[in-house]
Curated annotation (Swiss-Prot):
It comes from Anopheles gambiae. One of its GO terms (biological process) is Mo-molybdopterin cofactor biosynthetic process. Keywords: Molybdenum cofactor biosynthesis, Pyridoxal phosphate, Transferase. Residues 601-770 form the MOSC domain. Its cofactor is pyridoxal 5'-phosphate. Pfam families: Aminotran_5, MOSC, MOSC_N. Sulfurates the molybdenum cofactor. Sulfation of molybdenum is essential for xanthine dehydrogenase (XDH) and aldehyde oxidase (ADO) enzymes in which molybdenum cofactor is liganded by 1 oxygen and 1 sulfur atom in active form. PANTHER family: MITOCHONDRIAL AMIDOXIME REDUCING COMPONENT 1 (PTHR14237:SF19), MOLYBDOPTERIN COFACTOR SULFURASE MOSC (PTHR14237). It comes from the Eukaryota. It catalyses: Mo-molybdopterin + L-cysteine + AH2 = thio-Mo-molybdopterin + L-alanine + A + H2O. This is Molybdenum cofactor sulfurase. The active site is at 395.
Length: 770
């Protein structure tokens, strides 16, 4: 079936105008969060600016407004206050936790009911196991759950008497598979096989489902529904709901803690007497609820229905499903020259029906030999193409484990090998630890899907049957030159800006590596560190050091160089302000000294971004390398980065001349610049630095901390700031998905009064494995 546009031209135009910030960006993580529209924020601002909204414990007007929002939200889900109560929470996780700590599994003197959860559930559901007050806790497989659809009602089934709880998602957040909502009624009426005495109540995790699909609670009536509003509207965050069917309210009596506003009376004496309020929301909404965000839901609901009139969520479902199906089929059709698949798709449906499949596509990329490309590399390539997507296991270990065919022992082995949730350790022994997820929303365009598919095709489809050379072939084809030497020294006084190349003599060492390397950084108006990942044109700021001062130049400000004292704070001629600022570099909190207003104005004009500040690293809180406790400046991982020109030459030969996105292949020097190394050496053979464990450069000794894992920074032309797909693509291909090039070094021994001389001989020490 061909792609059919759901929205009219006028509707598409309005949506594009409301999301003008997506003009050159491709956002494909709507399952992570929806995006808010510009008119939506304006409407929220007008609402808040146009009224006096007090604490609801103070103002009856605010109470009435909150009740109106409850009614509107219930109506959004096709139900009414007579059938469901709505309890505001901080999100789906808080709603699930509230059910877990409140659900009564039976009187204390009787055998408790069961807590059963689908294995393909979000981590927040797994966490419920630690709170429920029953020892009868069991997972259920997908096939077992679906079996309840065909389970006939057993007239001989004994009358169930143990209150029990089943939790499953309306839609799997891993791959968008939808579960039949008829299960809610069937299981509450007929129970589950093997649980004869259990009277089940269904808790439906609707967070993923309601983001792009309608939920009709007049037709499907689970006991409990958990959701988050940012999944639907993008804003507000930190606000969710627990919807409780009226006849299930008595089951939520187990919660012991009570907060302000939830009791009729509470005595402060030793007998701890208190009486909870009657209405369920009044009993469970501890303290002051997020009343301004609750009020903001009104313009959020109105904006979405204005942009997409008619049955809004039905139309969004049709639009996003078509996008997902188009993406699925396009990826499925990709082939390597040898006929091999380019992607592994992890799905339970073939995208035949929007009632069984949501707007999520999950996959991993395959090399032409069938081996997997790591998801971290795909994420880097996507970022290099302006594509926002999600990688990992998406807080759904059960679905991830099932689709990647990983046993529990595999997961434990990966954990012992250093892999944890959210890291970039994407392949262990060639086995993927996660996958790539793309998901779609109402503001997603078909061109966004085509952009993703084009990226995968360009970066990963091998069109030639010629394979890469083996390591032995590489070494055999490269002849010896001279003895390895240090041919260039580079330092980067301002993090992520251009290099200062040392052309004569040498350069002094410091406790953190090269003296003044990454001593300064630029932060945005919120204090977040700026890098070329965010602003590639930072490479056009060129530094120099003379007479104890840092001089910054930019081609657009050629007649206005900026001069900064290396040890002080401000520009030459401006008093140094002792204004300390906090920022983060690679998850480390870093203290910096603000270099003053003139410096801030200069970097803002040079980079064309308002509100930037220039900071110098403060010596009051020295930064330390996590593994070794060695002193660090503002560099990312280690004190020094060594790059081998011979290896870069080998890499350049591996990249085809036509693979530079229409541009001429860069010179060797220009390609070396992309790796932003400190110590540029030239050895006899390419890649031999990968085997070194220690390095001697002249009289100075260094310890190898490990290989440098590359990111999309090496795809930025350091002369222009333009991006290309290479050389990251070739590095991944040649090294089996491992994006490593160059090695990190740290100072060993005494560094005092040492200087690294250009032209010094380089000796790598190899420790043979036993």
């Amino acid at each position: 079936m061909d792609f059919v546009e759901e929205f009219t031209d006028e509707e598409r135009l309005k949506i594009e105008q409301d999301f003008s910030r997506l003009a050159d960006k491709c956002y494909l993580d709507h399952a992570g969060t929806a995006l808010y529209g510009e008119s939506q924020l304006r409407a929220v601002q007008e609402l808040l600016a146009g009224g006096l909204y007090c604490n609801p414990h103070t103002s009856r007007t605010m109470e009435d407004l909150i009740d109106l929002v409850r009614y509107r939200v219930l109506r959004w889900f096709q139900t009414r206050p007579a059938d469901y109560s709505l309890v505001f929470t901080s999100g789906t996780t808080a709603s699930l936790k509230l059910v877990a700590e409140s659900f009564e599994f039976g009187p204390g003197d009787a055998e408790p009911g069961s807590f059963v959860y689908l294995r393909d559930s979000h981590t927040s559901v797994l966490g419920m196991r630690e709170l429920v007050r029953t020892g009868r806790v069991q997972p259920i497989e997908r096939a077992e759950l679906l079996q309840a659809l065909n389970e006939p009602e057993d007239p001989r089934r004994q009358h169930p008497h143990r209150p029990s709880l089943l939790v499953f998602p309306a839609q799997c957040n891993f791959n968008g598979a939808k579960y039949p909502l008829e299960l809610c009624e069937l299981i509450e009426r007929n129970g589950l096989r093997g649980y004869g005495g259990d009277a089940f109540h269904v808790c439906l995790d609707a967070a993923s489902h309601v983001s792009t699909s309608p939920l009709d609670l007049s037709r499907y009536r689970p006991s409990f529904v958990c959701l988050s509003f940012y999944k639907i509207f993008g804003y507000p965050t930190g606000l969710g709901a627990l919807l409780v069917r009226r006849d299930a309210e008595p089951l939520l009596r187990g919660k012991r803690y009570y907060g302000g506003g939830t009791v009729k009376i509470a005595l402060s004496g030793p007998d701890r007497f208190h009486e909870r309020r009657d209405a369920l929301p009044d009993r469970l909404e501890d303290g002051t609820i997020n009343f301004l965000s609750i009020a903001a839901l009104l313009p959020c609901l109105e904006t979405l229905t204005r942009l997409i009139p008619g049955p809004t969520m039905d139309r969004i479902q049709r639009h996003t499903f078509q996008l997902a199906r188009h993406c699925y089929r396009e990826l499925q059709a990709l082939q390597h020259a040898n006929g091999g698949r380019v992607v592994d798709l992890y799905h339970d449906t073939a995208f035949g029906d929007a009632r069984t499949q949501g707007a999520i596509v999950n996959f991993n990329v395959l090399n032409d030999d069938g081996g997997h490309v790591g998801f971290a590399e795909v994420a880097c390539m996507a970022a290099n193409h302006g594509i926002y997507l999600r990688t990992g296991c998406f807080c759904n270990p059960g679905a991830c484990q099932r689709h990647l065919r990983l046993a529990d022992d595999d997961l434990l082995r990966h954990y012992r090998a250093g892999h944890v949730c959210g890291d970039a350790n994407d392949l262990i022994d060639g086995q993927p630890t996660g996958s790539v997820r793309v998901s779609f929303g109402y503001c997603t365009r078909r061109s966004d899907v085509d952009r993703l598919v084009a990226m995968v095709r360009r970066c990963y489809v091998r069109r030639s049957l010629t394979g890469p050379l083996s390591r032995a072939d590489v070494l055999a084809q490269y002849k010896s030159y001279d003895r390895p030497r240090l041919v260039q020294l580079c330092l980067y006084p301002v993090k992520s800006c251009g290099p200062l190349r040392v052309t004569t003599g040498g350069w002094p060492l410091a406790p953190t590596g090269l003296l003044y390397d990454r001593a300064f950084l630029i932060v945005d108006e919120h204090g977040a560190a700026m890098t070329q990942k965010k602003l590639p044109t930072m490479c056009r700021i060129r530094p120099d050091i003379a007479d104890g001062r840092l001089v910054l130049r930019h081609a657009d400000l050629e007649d206005e160089p900026l001069t900064i004292g290396l040890e002080g704070g401000g520009e030459a001629g401006e008093p140094a302000a002792a204004h300390l600022c906090q920022t983060k570099v690679c998850r480390d909190s870093v203290q910096g000294v603000d270099c003053g207003e003139r410096a801030a104005d200069w970097v803002s004009r040079a980079l064309g971004v308002s509100g930037l500040r220039l900071l110098r690293q403060s010596g009051q809180e020295p930064r330390r390398q996590r593994q070794t406790d060695r002193a660090l400046s503002l560099n990312n991982q280690a004190q020094l980065l060594l790059i081998n020109r011979t290896s870069v030459r080998w890499l350049r030969d591996k990249v085809g001349d036509g693979d530079w996105d229409g541009a001429d292949a860069p010179s060797l020097d220009a390609l070396v610049d992309r790796f932003r190394g400190n110590l540029i050496v030239e050895t006899v053979r390419p890649l031999e630095e990968s085997d070194w464990r220690q390095v001697l450069i002249g009289p100075s000794q260094f310890t190898v901390d490990g290989p440098c894992t590359r990111c999309q920074m090496i795809c930025i032309d350091q002369a222009t700031g333009e991006r290309t797909a290479e050389p990251l693509r070739t590095i991944s291909r040649e090294f089996g998905g491992r994006m490593r090039f160059g090695v990190y070094l740290s100072l060993a021994g005494d560094w005092a009064d040492r200087e690294l001389p250009l032209g010094a001989t380089v000796s790598g020490v190899i420790e043979e494995s036993e």
